Amino acid sequence: PRMPEQWTVPLGEGAEILAERYGIARAVQDAFALRSHQRAAAAWRAERFAGEIVPVPGAEIDRDESVRGDTSLDALARLRPVFREQGTVTAGNSSPMNDGAAAVLLAGERAASGLGVEPLARIAARAVSAVDPHLYGIGPVEAAAVALRRAGIGWGDLGVVELNEAFAAQALACLARWPELDRAIVNPNGGAIALGHPIGASGARILTTLVHELRRRGARWGMATMCIGVGQGIAVVVEAT
């Protein structure tokens, strides 16, 4: 059956709802966005993305164009709200809908061994949750809890967490529900606010970044998680090999 035309709110309005519900001020959202850009710019300078990037031939593109390492809180503060006249969600503290592509190869242990492929990581657990579509941004909260429980580990066991940054307000709402999570390990190389959110590719992208960062740090456990605009969340726990 067809879905009703007006059955939920636009994604940006959903971010405004979360900002209001969790008391996330505009300045806090802008600071989160600035951190995303600064971390992504630092990661590019340190060539931490080199192992996971495949350049596009032709007019060669080998770097995300939306990273603005030179932005500032003043620059972000000058941007007008997009979804409400007196709102807090702007183009600067939201993810850009970049073009992009990502691919991962999944195989069972026997198949990988037979092909002589050395796995980068093992999927330990995954979970999907459902929430009120108006509050889609907190979908990762329950999904993450279930995935951790299924993997038999806790927040303190994680070495890296990749939380997709659809909006700063959305990501901060999730973090507010995870007080036991060390924020220093969340998106250490920046997130979608800086790197972009190519719909259909972001899940594979954050999973790829997660696995490479786990191996770079010598950490064992990691999680990739994201909200889904129609009222869901998804989380995957991986173990680096």
What is each model feature region?
Residues 1-17, 22:
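Flexible glycine-/small-residue-enriched beta->alpha junction loops
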Residues 13-16, 124-194:
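Active-site pocket-lining segment
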Residues 18-25, 86-96, 127, 157-166, ...:
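Cysteine-centered functional microenvironments
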Residues 19-48, 103-110, 198-219, 236-238:
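Active-site-proximal alpha-helical scaffold in enzymes
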Residues 24, 48, 117, 153, ...:
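Helix N-cap/coil-helix junction residues
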Residues 28-114, 180-185:
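N-terminal extracellular/periplasmic Venus flytrap/periplasmic-binding protein-like
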Residues 74-138, 142-150, 208-209, 214-221, ...:
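Condensing-enzyme catalytic core mediating Claisen C-C bond formation in acyl metabolism
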Residues 155, 173, 177, 182-187, ...:
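Internal helix-turn-beta structural module
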